[in-house]
Amino acid sequence: MTAIVEPTWEERRTPEAAHEDDARSQYRKDYSRIIHSAALRRLQTKTQVLGLGDSDFYRTRLTHSLEVAQIGVGILLEIQRRFAGSNIEKYLPDERLLEAICLSHDYGHPPFGHGGERALNFAMREYGGFEGNAQTFRILSKLEKYSQNSGLNPTRRTLLGVLKYPTTYSNSMTNDFRRGTDIDKYPDAELKPPKCIYDCDLDVLDWVLKIFCSEDVTEFKKLDYKCKPLHKSLDCSLMETADDIAYTVHDLEDCIKLKLINREMWDAYIKSADYSEATRLEIEKWNQRIFSKEGNLVKQGISNMVYFFIHSVIQYEHEELSHPILKYGFKLGEEAARLRSAIQKIITNEVIKTHRVRVLESKGQRMIFSIFGELVRDPESFLPRETLDKYNKATGNLRMRVICDYVSGMTDEYATKTYQRFFTPKFGSVFDV
């Protein structure tokens, strides 16, 4: 009689032979695979805020991911200090596990940011859609080169950590795209994908959640009235909080450096009277530094902001869930969250929604949709050999998924060149790759 093997956190979907002379933990192995992955390298040419420029100062998705990992560990260390000896402490991730989760959280970010995401979601509307976080989950578990069919073949807990939305596209999709096949007829809000994983990756989700009791799995997958998942794991909450801190503070730094945001704009949005005395003093400290002409003072101000947000993290509980890794989570405290939202509103209104950035995003959206259309029209002629082999082996909707995987993996620069080779007269040669 075969013994039943209980699932574990360090288990991988495809079993691997152990090396006796390998001193690394399973999570260190995950971290190593992510560090050396092509998906991580591609993030170096995907900009964090579209259109900020080509200077080596401005952040890319790669530098952002590195900063998320560092902030994530900072939050973890603060929590370990604060909860030393408590029941929660033994369920906290180790540093390498959290770094692995944070480093890979943007794997699925498509070319041209949200414009690219909207274009691919519309192009895939009849074939399972597209969503950046769903693509991250797919890259880690199926696409990235390491194993035959399991991507990087990461541990169960690493996959759970990047799983922001534990529901499928078909369960959460609310838009039926009744306006027809012309993408230009749809406002951006109608092109946005639901927060999900793909239906074709449900097998991985089921495997990840196999470690929990059926009651927890049912509750964990529940959606709110907007069809958005209600829950995420402890590790994912740490990653998401670090991500929120990183992109808010560091996008602000880039925008100040570019002179897109000035002190007058800041004062118009950040009303210190709206906050407690301790937070008002903190804001005043930032005011004296982040707009200084001295680079060292600016950097100190940005560091002060990160420190403030890290030390504002609080613990929460979902009483409906029983397993501690689903039950417990961490987020910014109410006042810190309100302040972060105010800072993000400056960036959104004064930079991201400006004509300059919106034109670039719209252009990127059109380019990605056009590239996808050409590849679908004649995959035999236009897909690279390796991708074409996958396409020919796939059936049904999965053929379109192969094309979507290929386009979403392009960098901004490669997508631009691909578009030009298709549509710009006299551009390109047989030597282009």
Curated annotation (Swiss-Prot):
Residues 61-248 form the HD domain. Gene3D superfamilies: Hypothetical protein af1432. Keywords: Hydrolase. InterPro entries: dGTPase (IPR006261), dGTPase-like (IPR050135), dNTPase_2 (IPR023023), HD/PDEase_dom (IPR003607), HD_domain (IPR006674), PHydrolase_assoc_dom (IPR026875). One of its GO terms (molecular function) is dGTPase activity. NCBIfam families: antiphage_dGTPase, dGTP_triPase, PRK05318.1. Belongs to the dGTPase family. Type 2 subfamily. This is Deoxyguanosinetriphosphate triphosphohydrolase-like protein 2.
